[in-house]
């Protein structure tokens, strides 16, 4: 059973958004504090830099339940919150014995011979504790809601062995948003106990899977972060550029959302929208024919292929842009994708336009065999003419994931290569390498930050800064907004 404690519980301040859950429970967890108090140098506690321990009572955890939290309202009434993860129990109780034991231990610590021997002095942490316990700013409902919201929002991660009783590499996660508003809003008296089990409520405990999707019931409301497994409200996610609210991780974006992010409103002019694949090698699998898969992804995404190409303006600067979409068959590059990108490059060369390609692909499309592989050479040949003969400017933007034939061709041929933070970029994926070479791929060796240190990229640019960075790069290479050009001619 895991034991948790609010680090900010004993502050006089209200519960802060940063209140973390401490797993190392040898003593009460560390509280961040910028001041240094020589009276707090208590022996036999874990060392930790830049933090001070609240107090060092050796056996204080003997009477605290493994999953119990203590809170109080503005009237001075104290309540304990019990969260039994193994048995899926949530309980709130106002039994004061918990508080009495904690205060008794605190007074015992205060009056101990250790403090009387010169270490008692002024104890700001004790004062903060007493002030907090009897003079908090929150009412009961707001306090509990804030408390549980922060608790479930934090990175609560329980080994699946706790749930299933067996060893597993996966994790189980509690989703705060699923139970908030239903499990917490109680019309019962404050003195009553509230117990909620998964059978009677929407509190959900489930194992993480490779696709990292939330339960079907809430899939239309929430998007799960691939990094911290937190939930992001889908309605607001687009306005936040698909960046996780909890950890700042850059989630996948559709090609349409990227075009909306980079291209000025009303300036997008798509190219070759009616170009579709005709199953050139008549690839048929036992599960689903290739043509049926294409039709299925077309209905699902509203796209005809895994890339959108066209002309638009970026802060008034005319640009040719291609944006790959990982949601369409993993952004795989088939004959249509290769042809659309090649035509875009040729059009940019004829019109003397700067070129941007946003890469998000699993590589060449196996359902088209060697026809998909030859797209690598065809696109590279078009770029050779565009860059070396026409002397024009090409920016490659690598997003997560960019792998296979895209990495081995136009993805790495940019005059400037930009990667998004934490993007997964590789030629062969981790699983392929490990199965082929029978060697373990080091963790993080295919992440953008590691590859940047090895010199593979020029920049790692956060999504919210990308448009302004591109605008400055284009101006640096003598591509200016249309209105600015006309004013210079006059």
Swiss-Prot record:
Pathway: Lipid metabolism; malonyl-CoA biosynthesis; malonyl-CoA from acetyl-CoA: step 1/1. Binds 1 zinc ion per subunit. Zn(2+) binds at residues 225, 228, 244, 247. Residues 221-490 form the CoA carboxyltransferase N-terminal domain. Disulfide bonds: none annotated. InterPro entries: AcCoA_carboxyl_beta, Acetyl_CoA_COase_Trfase_b_su, ClpP/crotonase-like_dom_sf, COA_CT_N. Its cofactor is Zn(2+). A zinc finger (C4-type) spans 225-247. The keyword Aminoacyl-tRNA synthetase does not apply. Expressed in leaves, ripening and mature fruit. It is an enzyme of class 2 (transferase). This is Acetyl-coenzyme A carboxylase carboxyl transferase subunit beta, chloroplastic. It comes from Solanum lycopersicum (Tomato). The gene is accD.
């Amino acid at each position: 059973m895991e034991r948790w404690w609010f680090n900010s519980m004993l502050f006089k301040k209200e519960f802060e958004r940063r209140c973390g859950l401490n797993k190392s429970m040898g003593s009460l967890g560390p509280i961040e504090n910028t001041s240094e108090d020589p009276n707090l140098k208590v022996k036999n506690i874990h060392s930790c830099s830049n933090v001070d321990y609240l107090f060092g009572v050796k056996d204080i955890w003997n009477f605290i339940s493994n999953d119990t939290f203590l809170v109080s309202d503005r009237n001075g009434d104290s309540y304990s919150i019990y969260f039994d993860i193994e048995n899926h129990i949530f309980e709130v109780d106002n039994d004061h014995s918990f508080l009495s034991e904690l205060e008794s231990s605190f007074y015992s610590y205060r009056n101990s011979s250790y403090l009387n021997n010169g270490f008692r002095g002024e104890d700001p942490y004790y004062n903060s504790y007493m002030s907090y316990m009897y003079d908090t700013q929150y009412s009961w409902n707001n306090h509990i809601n804030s408390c549980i919201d922060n608790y479930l929002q934090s990175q609560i991660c329980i080994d699946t062995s706790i749930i299933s009783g067996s060893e597993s590499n996966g994790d189980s996660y509690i989703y705060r948003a699923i139970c908030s508003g239903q499990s917490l809003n109680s019309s019962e008296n404050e003195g009553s106990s509230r117990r909620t089990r998964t059978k009677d409520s929407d509190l959900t405990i489930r194992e993480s899977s490779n696709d990292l999707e939330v339960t079907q019931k809430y899939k239309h409301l929430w998007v799960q972060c691939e990094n911290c497994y937190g939930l992001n409200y889908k309605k607001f996610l687009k306005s936040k550029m698909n960046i996780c609210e909890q950890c700042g991780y850059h989630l996948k974006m559709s090609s349409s959302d990227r075009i909306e992010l980079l291209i000025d409103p009303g300036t997008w002019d798509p190219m070759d929208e009616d170009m579709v694949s005709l199953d050139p090698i008549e690839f048929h699998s036992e599960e689903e024919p290739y043509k049926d898969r294409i039709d299925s992804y077309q209905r699902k995404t509203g796209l005809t292929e895994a890339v959108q190409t066209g002309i638009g303006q970026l802060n008034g600067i005319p640009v040719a842009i291609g944006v790959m979409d990982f949601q369409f068959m993993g952004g795989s590059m088939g004959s249509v994708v290769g042809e659309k990108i090649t035509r875009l490059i040729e059009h940019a060369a004829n019109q003397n336009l700067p070129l941007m390609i946003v890469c998000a692909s699993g590589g060449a499309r196996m359902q088209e065999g060697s026809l998909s592989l030859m797209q690598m050479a065809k696109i590279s040949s078009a770029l050779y003419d565009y860059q070396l003969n026409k002397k024009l400017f090409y920016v490659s933007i690598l997003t997560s994931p960019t792998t296979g034939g895209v990495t081995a061709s136009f993805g790495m041929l940019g005059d400037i290569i930009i990667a998004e933070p934490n993007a997964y970029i590789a030629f062969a994926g981790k699983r392929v390498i490990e199965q082929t070479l029978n060697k373990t791929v080091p963790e993080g060796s295919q992440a953008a930050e590691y590859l940047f240190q090895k010199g593979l990229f020029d920049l790692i640019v956060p999504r919210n800064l990308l448009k302004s960075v591109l605008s400055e790069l284009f101006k640096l290479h003598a591509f200016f907004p249309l209105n600015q050009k006309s004013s210079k001619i006059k």
